[in-house]
Amino acid sequence: MDKQLLIFDFDGTLIDSVPDLADAVNAMLTTLGKAPYPIDTIRNWVGNGSRMLVERALVGKIEVSEGELAKETIDHAEQVFFDAYSKMGGSKTVAYPNVDSGLKKLKAAGFKLALVTNKPIRFVPKILQFFGWHDIFSEVLGGDSLPTKKPDPAPLLHVCEVLNINPAQAVMIGDSINDILAGQNANMDTLGLSYGYNYGQDIRQLNPTEAFDDFSALVDYLLKAYPANN
């Protein structure tokens, strides 16, 4: 079946935002009287939304047990993190190589593009504006736009419904287990990118439809695999 809709993850797929996120996490920890962590440690905590990132930073590990932290503790820390991240202004966030030109090629080829991220939606428009991508995507969802987020398939299915596209005609593209599972749970083709944030696990171990080490290779594949859109 022809593919009409390409649904992209954001952090770790299109942009590397870890330098800003790490600065905000460490600013939060310092404010709370805790020791900061190296950027490479924080990199492995990114991908499940801001609240989980905050929880991991508070306990200093990727696995957080239920009830390990009081809700009030997380709520306060998350607000401190949000305040710090807002002040960062995205100055250290960069687009991965070939992403800007690749997105424009795909849009010009006739695909509809959507963005589904677990990042809080309040931080997304400013980044899109900075990179000049505000008119690239037909639909944009953040991790708090709906009651559930990836790996739940609901955000992907919601995008399909809004854009009136059969889920079988959509492709989920991302760098982590949350993206691949969301796409698989929505019965979509899934395309993995190996360079992002996947907790140290090779994206190919998740059995995506295809996987790529570079965004330009992904674009070439899409243009050849689904030529009806050209």
From Swiss-Prot:
Entry's EC annotation: 3.1.3.18
Q: Active-site residues?
A: 9
Q: Which cofactor does it need?
A: Mg(2+)
From the record, give the transmembrane residue ranges: none
Q: Which SUPFAM superfamilies match?
A: HAD-like
User: Which keywords does this chain's UniProt record carry?
Assistant: Carbohydrate metabolism, Hydrolase, Magnesium, Metal-binding
Q: Which GO terms describe its molecular function?
A: metal ion binding; phosphoglycolate phosphatase activity
Sorted alphabetically, the Gene Ontology cellular component annotations on this record are: cytosol
Q: Per the record, what are the reactions this protein catalyses?
A: 2-phosphoglycolate + H2O = glycolate + phosphate
According to UniProt, this protein's pathway is: Organic acid metabolism; glycolate biosynthesis; glycolate from 2-phosphoglycolate: step 1/1
- GO terms for biological process? carbohydrate metabolic process; DNA repair; glycolate biosynthetic process
Top-level EC class, please? hydrolase
Q: Residues that bind Mg(2+), according to the entry?
A: 9, 11, 175
| HAMAP family from the UniProt entry | GPH_hydrolase_bact
Described purpose of this protein according to its UniProt entry? Specifically catalyzes the dephosphorylation of 2-phosphoglycolate. Is involved in the dissimilation of the intracellular 2-phosphoglycolate formed during the DNA repair of 3'-phosphoglycolate ends, a major class of DNA lesions induced by oxidative stress.
Family the UniProt entry places it in: Belongs to the HAD-like hydrolase superfamily. CbbY/CbbZ/Gph/YieH family.
Q: What is this protein called?
A: Phosphoglycolate phosphatase
Q: Which organism is it from?
A: Psychrobacter arcticus (strain DSM 17307 / VKM B-2377 / 273-4)
**Top-level taxonomy:** Bacteria, Pseudomonadati, Pseudomonadota, Gammaproteobacteria, Moraxellales
